[in-house]
Swiss-Prot record:
Known catalytic reactions: tRNA(Tyr) + L-tyrosine + ATP = L-tyrosyl-tRNA(Tyr) + AMP + diphosphate + H(+)
GO CC terms, sorted: cytosol
Cross-referenced InterPro entries: aa-tRNA-synth_Ic, Rossmann-like_a/b/a_fold, S4_RNA-bd, S4_RNA-bd_sf, SYY-like_C, Tyr-tRNA-ligase, Tyr-tRNA-ligase_bac-type, Tyr-tRNA-ligase_bac_2
Organism: Chlorobium chlorochromatii (strain CaD3)
Subunit structure: Homodimer.
EC number: 6.1.1.1
Domain S4 RNA-binding, chain residue ranges per copy: 339-402
Any Gene Ontology biological process: tyrosyl-tRNA aminoacylation
Official protein name in the record: Tyrosine--tRNA ligase
Pfam families linked to this entry: SYY_C-terminal, tRNA-synt_1b
Length: 402
């Protein structure tokens, strides 16, 4: 197989990375690969703790695709078994454990989502439950003998919890060993992960060496900050943009990020767009609004199509720039001829509770036919022409009495 030059490969592989352990070893593996004509095997694992992948996952998936574009082979591991342990990386307390059924259910759609980025024909998909689930207790004891408690406490999250006298469960020590056994089983050449995975990647490297296998090169990628601009992107923190979001939601969420994140998002999520990326970067200082809109369009286009991106932008402008209701609102016919505004908002699902409905009215985020509602005690007449209720920025309802 013909590969690009070693320097061309290194230029693409090192782009956007945080750390490579080590660059010299990576170069040696690339040279050997070029001489033999055999592609390197590049491993990436994803625990299905939630059913949806999000743009935070796309950062490492995009790097895996970079390797594929250079002619190398991707191995995507669905961590059905490790998800039952719960990755302690970056956690201040023990993570809830998933059942085998929950992990399998969540992981079912991961591959379909991942191939929005990866080349499916050049990707091996596997579940680590296949080999980790087959290990005996004697195997686990032998595996555990390769690492000490002192080594485990070297990782920051364990050390901080130990000093704070927060409990650390024994099964949490097994997580990096289990992930490391993935590398022993697969004999991969390179493993990718976020910066929070560095310890786990190094354990895999050590275990490969212990088992007489050439140690993997470890490559860490930046963690994508969520749309709130504060924490790592996570579905549990409600700051994520998911692969399965609709084009409209994906565009709107992308536009909601702080201006300070436009460059980071663009570099990490749009590196494949070349000239378009450079144009976005050149606009950030002079016109961040245009830069952010272009960024959001390209994100949607990447996961759907340019046409879907244009439609999502048009939808956003109609709702939030021109403040018009969508054309396709379903008419909801209510039994009552009138209703207190608080009750109406909760009935429609615009507010989860009466107290939240009051808060929305107080914040002046409720209107009926473009007229702001500021009175908690307002009673809304429902007879006659249909009315458009707007609650917050994104919720619209078309209502009338039966």
């Amino acid at each position: 197989m013909n590969f690009p030059s070693i320097q061309e490969q290194l230029d693409l592989i090192t782009r956007n990375t945080v750390e490579i352990i080590s660059v010299d070893e990576l170069e040696q593996k690339l040279v050997s690969s070029q001489k033999s004509g055999k592609p390197l095997n590049i491993k990436l694992g994803a625990d299905p703790s939630r059913p949806d992948l999000h743009l935070g996952h796309s950062v490492v998936l995009r790097k895996l695709r970079d390797f594929q574009d250079l002619g190398h082979h991707a191995i995507l591991i669905i961590g059905n078994f490790t998800a039952m342990i719960g990755d302690p990386s970056g956690k201040s307390k023990t993570r809830p454990q998933l059942s085998a059924e929950e992990a399998a259910e969540n992981g079912r759609s991961y591959f379909e989502q991942a191939i929005k980025i990866l080349d499916a024909a050049n990707t091996t998909l596997c579940s680590n439950a296949d080999w980790l689930g087959a290990m005996t207790f004697a195997d686990v004891i032998r595996l555990s003998s390769h690492y000490t408690v002192a080594r485990m406490l070297e990782r920051n999250d364990f050390e901080q919890r130990y000093r704070a006298q927060e409990p650390i469960s024994i099964h949490e020590f097994l997580y990096p060993l289990a992930q490391g056994m993935d590398s022993v089983h697969l004999k991969n050449d390179v493993e990718l992960g976020g910066t929070d995975q560095k310890f786990n990647l190094l354990v895999g490297r050590d275990l490969q060496r212990e088992y007489g296998i050439a140690p993997q090169v470890c490559i860490t990628m930046p963690l994508l900050v969520g749309t709130d601009g504060k924490d790592k992107m996570s579905k549990s923190l409600d700051n994520a943009i998911s692969f399965t979001d609709t084009p409209n939601d994906m565009y709107g969420r992308a536009l909601s990020i702080p201006d300070t994140l436009i460059e980071t998002y663009s570099r990490l999520l749009l590196s494949q767009f070349g000239a378009a990326l450079n144009e976005i970067l050149s606009q950030i200082e002079t016109n961040p609004r245009l830069a952010k809109r272009a960024m959001a369009r390209h994100i949607v286009a990447d996961y759907y199509s340019p046409e879907a991106a244009s439609a999502a932008e048009e939808h956003f402008d109609k709702l939030f720039v021109h403040k018009q209701a969508p054309d396709n609102l379903e008419l909801l016919e209510l039994e009552a001829t009138s209703m207190p505004i608080i009750d109406l908002l909760t009935l429609l699902g615009a507010a989860p509770s009466k107290s939240e409905a009051r808060r929305m009215i107080q914040a002046k985020s409720v209107s009926i036919d473009d007229e702001k509602i500021e009175d908690f005690n307002a009673v809304i007449a429902l007879e006659g022409e249909a009315k458009i209720v707007r609650a917050g920025k994104r919720k619209f309802f078309k209502i009338r009495s039966k």
